[in-house]
């Protein structure tokens, strides 16, 4: 009898183990299914965002503000869009409100809470050549690591690539840095955001004049003073000054638009200054990389730009018209300081052709967070990169409400 009971107990134990294994297998299958469906829901959210961005693509010359339809879509993650049994929450933000890592200058880097080692190493990573800066690093350093690799020596591909650079740690990138010592800083602002929230890639904007046409490229080889006078709507003598100055530059090219502002008869003339800011460019491209949109950027980002003090940055943000700055020359009402106007000519804009789509897809109890970079290419919103976050708290990092407070059934639209 004892033997029979022991045998029965063994069988029951085996059945229990088998049942537990089966339950685990079912749970795993359900989790995988929910993970897949949540990601599909997030991807659907990205596609939904593209339809909203089409209005910007249809009028790329118009100013871009966060109060536009695309900017209020999803109520900063507070609205849930239901598709079948799944749902997604989303937010679209202007990518041109950030500093572009592939165009950021040493002077701008110096106004971020970074050490000289981090600045030198970043520039060495991005630039060609094998001679490191004093506190930087090239292949000799990276090849000596336990897992060796080479310097990029080119454009960064992702923001998280920063973590491969000497001196750049997760703490530096993701946490607010308040104790960084950098004697090269020209501003004294107290950081309130992590560097990760201030920088990006592929930050594009449009170079259009008030009529919606491409700005006049003052570096165009065959551009005459008469043509510049007509196109930019400035007196012939000012146009002649600009063309003559261009012709004595190295390679007969201006390297910065601000060089024009400092020419005789230009900087002190408000009418001509407006034309320089609104109607001139130094590139043939209608799409420009690395300019900051004053309609969407925070004062913290703006004050990183040399020549743009914290007071002026706050004035730009606080003085924004309800429908945004229409033309860059409107900054003249904020300040006539020449250092600021020099910065404005080289680094600021009122448009954008690049956006970040933040989306959280949900299926069952599972959520998947994605962030897509969308650029306007040939009047079509185009996804150029999608990243799935390794953080479990992305809605919190995006400062979203914990839960949505409104629901939209897309099936009924």
Give residue ranges: language-model regions.
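Compositionally biased linear targeting/interaction segments
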Residues: 1-413
């Amino acid at each position: 009898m004892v033997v029979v009971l022991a045998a029965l107990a063994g069988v029951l134990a085996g059945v229990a183990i088998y049942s537990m294994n089966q339950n685990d297998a079912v749970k795993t299958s359900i989790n995988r299914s929910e993970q897949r469906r949540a990601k599909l829901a997030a991807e659907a959210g990205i596609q939904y965002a593209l339809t909203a961005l089409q209005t910007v693509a249809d009028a790329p010359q118009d100013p871009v503000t966060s109060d536009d339809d695309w900017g209020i879509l999803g109520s900063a993650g507070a609205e849930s869009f239901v598709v079948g049994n799944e749902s997604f929450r989303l937010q679209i933000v202007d990518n041109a409100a950030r500093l572009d890592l592939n165009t950021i200058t040493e002077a701008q880097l110096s106004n971020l809470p970074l050490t000289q080692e981090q600045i030198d190493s970043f520039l060495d990573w991005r630039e060609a050549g094998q001679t490191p800066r004093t506190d930087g690093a090239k292949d000799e350093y990276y090849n000596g690591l336990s897992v060796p690799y080479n310097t990029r020596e080119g454009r960064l591909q992702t923001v998280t690539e920063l973590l491969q650079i000497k001196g750049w740690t997760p703490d530096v990138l993701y946490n607010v840095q308040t104790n960084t010592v950098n004697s090269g800083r020209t501003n004294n602002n107290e950081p309130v955001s992590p560097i990760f929230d201030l920088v990006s890639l592929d930050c594009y904007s449009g170079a259009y004049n008030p009529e919606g046409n491409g700005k006049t490229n003052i570096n165009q080889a065959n551009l005459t003073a008469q043509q510049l006078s007509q196109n930019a709507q400035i007196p012939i003598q000012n146009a002649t000054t600009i063309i003559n100055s261009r012709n004595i530059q190295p390679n007969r090219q201006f390297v910065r638009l601000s060089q024009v502002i400092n020419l005789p008869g230009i900087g002190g003339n408000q009418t001509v200054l407006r034309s320089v800011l609104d109607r001139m460019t130094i590139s043939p491209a209608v799409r420009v990389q690395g300019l900051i949109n004053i309609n969407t950027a925070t004062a913290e980002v703006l004050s990183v730009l040399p020549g743009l003090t914290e007071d002026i940055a706050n004035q730009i943000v606080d003085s924004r018209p309800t429908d945004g700055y229409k033309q860059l020359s409107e900054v003249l009402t904020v300040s006539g300081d020449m250092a600021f106007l020099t910065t404005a000519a080289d680094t600021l804009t009122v448009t954008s052709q690049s956006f970040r789509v933040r989306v959280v897809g949900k299926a069952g109890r599972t959520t998947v967070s994605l962030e897509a970079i969308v650029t306007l290419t040939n009047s079509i919103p185009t996804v150029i990169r999608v990243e799935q976050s390794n953080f479990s708290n992305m809605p919190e990092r995006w400062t979203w409400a914990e839960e949505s407070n409104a629901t939209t059934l897309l099936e009924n639209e």
